[in-house]
Amino acid sequence: MSSGRGSRIPEYWYGQVPVPPFMRFMEVIYAGAVSLRRLAYRRGWRRRYGVAVPVVVIGNLVAGGTGKTPLTIEIVARLREAGWTPGIASRGYGRRDPKTPRWIQPDTPIELAGDEPAMIAWKTGMRVRVDVDRSAAARALVAEGCDIVVCDDGLQHYRLMRDIEIEVIDGQRRYGNGHLLPAGPLREPMVRGRLCDFRVLNAGQYSDRPTSGFGPSDWQMRLHIDHAQSLQGSRRRSLDAFSGQRVHAVAGIAHPERFFSMLRQRGIGVVPHAFPDHHFYRAEDFTFGSRLPVLMTEKDAVKCRAFADDWFFSVPLRVELPTVFWTALFDRLERLVSC
């Protein structure tokens, strides 16, 4: 049984029950506000800010997680391999004192960093700037010598001018019932995704060609798990070592069941513990009543290192995308810098 502490998503968002009439009314108001805001930026009524280097924005249209951060980390790694010096801009959701801009290091206290920026800094070793104003974060990164800015989330942050937009779509939930907030999960209408340069479908069937049923700039991404890393020391174990065993599986992410399912597919007996997205852990959260290994996502692990023991393991995600996707992305970047 799950601990039942995961964040609650309205059942009508994903079609289990009809949308309440009042929410349909609120959706109309929200839709008008979204359209007016986008028009204000298009017409120049609200100012936009750019920087002198390419800006890549990775985001989604729905509220909640879709796999943006693992893709951000993989893109940053590929950029480094290609000789770029990327910097990462993020809002830093859930951190203390959220209006204060801050540089995030791998050892920045989690309550000051936010879990996703902390994980990005830990995994990439690159400069990470958190700021509610992504354009200010981008300027700070460029001032520190970054020659490309990758924005983790921020598709709706039109204040920051961008060169490449990548929409990430949940391969299972897609756009839910297709309604805008609060009647559905959409932050913007579905047609907004067609304006993005690339659309990445998380957890779709892998293919080395564009995704069937989408468009020529739509690609399928798979997330793989194959080992667990001890939070104390450098001990690494294959997930096969846990096959046939019971473990406490911990996930404080938007869709914890996805993580639990991935572990089950590896033959692991999962005792699930779902926590709210962005939950800040205490040692008391792990009083499970039985001494079993604890497997958790990397996003959770960065918040548990201070009190973890030898039984705590993080499970890294490995991103797989078609070779043609990377070729298309880097071709676009080369054209940008050669202009």
Curated annotation (Swiss-Prot):
The keyword Kinase applies. Keywords: ATP-binding, Kinase, Lipid A biosynthesis, Lipid biosynthesis, Lipid metabolism, Nucleotide-binding, Transferase. Disulfide bonds: none annotated. It holds the Pfam family LpxK. ATP binds at V62, A63, G64, G65, T66, G67, K68, T69. Pathway: Glycolipid biosynthesis; lipid IV(A) biosynthesis; lipid IV(A) from (3R)-3-hydroxytetradecanoyl-[acyl-carrier-protein] and UDP-N-acetyl-alpha-D-glucosamine: step 6/6. One of its GO terms (cellular component) is plasma membrane. Its EC number is 2.7.1.130. InterPro entries: LpxK (IPR003758), P-loop_NTPase (IPR027417). Transfers the gamma-phosphate of ATP to the 4'-position of a tetraacyldisaccharide 1-phosphate intermediate (termed DS-1-P) to form tetraacyldisaccharide 1,4'-bis-phosphate (lipid IVA). PANTHER family: TETRAACYLDISACCHARIDE 4'-KINASE (PTHR42724), TETRAACYLDISACCHARIDE 4'-KINASE, MITOCHONDRIAL-RELATED (PTHR42724:SF1). Belongs to the LpxK family. This is Tetraacyldisaccharide 4'-kinase. The lineage of its organism: Bacteria, Pseudomonadati, Pseudomonadota, Gammaproteobacteria, Lysobacterales.
